[in-house]
Structure formats: structure tokens, C-alpha cells
């Protein structure tokens, strides 16, 4: 329960929590099996109208280092990834007003024509923005992207699924219900996704537990989340700044997430 989660986070012994989480993992994957994916994150543009306070990545359209990736650069990055054994691409970027759905359909088709690789790409905020500037609804947008080669959605753009937090750190980004609805719609058309969380900006424990509750509830409804991935907020070079949350706090929350999200098969470590 939420109350048990809060109590154990505040008072539980970290090693005991870790052992309990490992036991939960072993029930799913006995014989000490752990899984991993080799993929590459490719950013197609750093031009973004969202301008989140925690972000050090975005640029304005006329900044000297603003870009939209060209296909030669894209294919070179994919070639490097394939040579290293990658089986998946995570293609993400800013909310660029010049990139309608046609850009992404062409991008995904060109990749699928050349490579036998999973396209795990576009976060919920990107999907909503693409739909908006292309005059489409969410379902039609996802169906068209799926037909073009999009296999699954990453969980980025969730940060913390509590609008009290979101209004402060990303006031121009979609709200909690919009993020959940994109995922629900993706699952309804047979497109799997992951769920994520960025902890440690201005959020508190009750915000994070609320976030997990929303994820678990949607998973009960659709069964469409393949994995949950969490990472810590990285202060510096952004408007929000602040302090970095401790590694022990991360491990404590990670262990409890394995116990709480009993309906999601994989808890994944972040590369970033």
C-alpha cells in the first residue's frame, strides 16, 4: 500500500529492502538471470518550445548550435550502434514546431528499410505535440507512426506524474492525465511502452508514491508497460538548479518500486 511504502522508505533497513526486492526479482527470473538491452539514444533535434526548467538540452530555433539531424548523420549513428550489437533505437528530441508527422513517418520508414532494428522512440509529450501541429488526434497519430515503423514508446516526459510538481518544473509540458492517456491509447492499439520517473528535483516522497500509483493503476487496466525506469535529477546548467539526491535514496526507492510495481515485469536501470 502507499502507507506501507512511505513507512518502509522512511524507516526500513536498506539492505533488507534490497534483499526483498531481489527475492521479488528471482520469482520472475530464477537462476540469477538479469536481462539487458543494447540500444542507442539519438536526438533528432534540440529545438524545443517546451523549455523545461530542469533541462540543459533545449535550444531556440535561431541559436548557433540548434540542429535537426540529417539522414547521413542519423544512419552513421545507427551503423555505429549496430556494429556494437544494438537491437533498439531510442530516437527523441525537442518539441520542434517545424517537424510535423510527415517528418517522423519518413524518418521511421527510412530506418526500417535499411535496418532490422526496434524503434523505441518518441515520448508522450512529443506525440501530443506532433498531433497538435499536424491537426490529428492522439490515436490517429500513433497509428500512423506505428504503420511507419514505430514499435514502442519510451516513458520519457513523465518526470513526476503529479501536477503540483509538473507546474513548477515543466509548466509548458503536458499534464499527468495527458501523459497517461497517450500511454493508454498506445496500449489500446497494441503498442507497448515503458514508464519512467525522474526523482529528486522539487518532488517529495508523496509525489513519487502518487506517480507509482498512477503507473500501477494503468498497468492493471492495460498491461502495456514493459518496464519501469527511474533516474535522479541532475542539477547544473539549467534554470532549476538545486541539489542532487543521494544514491542511497535512489536505491531505497528503487527497491521499494520493485515491490510496489508487482504487475510490471522489468525494473530497468537507467544509462544516464
Q: Each PLM stretch: what is its role?
A:
Residues 59-93, 113:
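Conserved alpha-helical substructure of the radical SAM core
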Residues 34-73:
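Canonical Radical SAM [4Fe-4S] cluster-binding loop centered on the CxxxCxxC motif
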Residues 52, 87-89, 101, 105-198:
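Radical SAM/AdoMet-radical enzyme domain recognition
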Residues 71-78, 136-144, 212:
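Short, acidic/polar
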Amino acid at each position: 500500500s502507499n502507507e506501507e511504502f512511505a513507512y518502509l522508505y522512511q524507516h526500513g533497513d536498506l539492505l533488507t529492502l534490497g534483499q526483498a526486492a531481489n527475492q521479488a526479482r528471482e520469482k520472475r527470473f530464477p537462476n540469477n538471470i538479469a536481462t539487458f538491452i543494447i540500444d542507442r539514444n539519438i536526438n533528432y533535434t534540440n529545438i524545443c518550445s517546451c523549455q523545461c526548467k530542469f533541462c540543459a538540452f533545449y535550444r531556440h530555433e535561431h541559436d548557433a548550435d540548434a540542429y535537426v539531424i540529417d539522414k547521413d548523420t542519423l544512419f552513421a549513428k545507427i551503423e555505429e550502434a549496430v556494429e556494437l550489437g544494438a537491437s533498439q533505437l531510442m530516437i527523441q528530441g525537442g518539441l520542434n514546431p517545424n517537424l510535423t508527422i510527415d517528418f517522423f513517418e519518413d524518418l521511421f520508414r527510412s530506418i526500417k528499410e535499411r535496418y532490422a532494428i526496434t524503434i523505441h522512440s518518441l515520448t508522450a509529450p512529443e506525440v501530443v505535440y506532433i498531433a497538435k501541429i499536424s491537426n490529428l488526434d492522439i490515436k490517429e497519430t500513433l497509428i500512423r507512426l506505428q504503420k511507419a515503423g514505430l514499435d514502442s514508446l519510451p516513458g520519457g516526459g513523465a518526470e513526476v506524474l503529479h501536477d503540483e510538481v509538473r507546474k513548477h518544473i515543466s509548466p509548458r509540458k503536458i499534464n499527468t492525465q495527458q501523459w497517461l492517456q497517450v500511454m493508454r491509447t498506445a496500449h489500446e492499439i497494441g503498442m507497448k511502452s515503458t514508464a519512467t520517473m525522474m526523482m529528486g528535483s522539487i518532488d517529495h516522497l508523496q509525489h513519487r508514491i502518487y506517480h507509482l500509483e498512477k503507473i500501477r493503476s494503468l498497468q492493471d487496466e492495460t498491461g502495456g508497460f514493459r518496464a519501469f525506469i527511474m533516474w535522479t535529477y541532475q542539477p547544473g546548467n539549467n534554470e532549476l538548479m538545486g541539489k542532487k539526491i543521494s544514491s542511497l535514496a535512489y536505491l531505497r526507492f528503487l527497491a521499494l518500486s520493485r515491490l510496489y510495481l508487482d504487475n510490471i515485469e522489468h525494473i530497468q536501470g537507467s544509462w544516464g
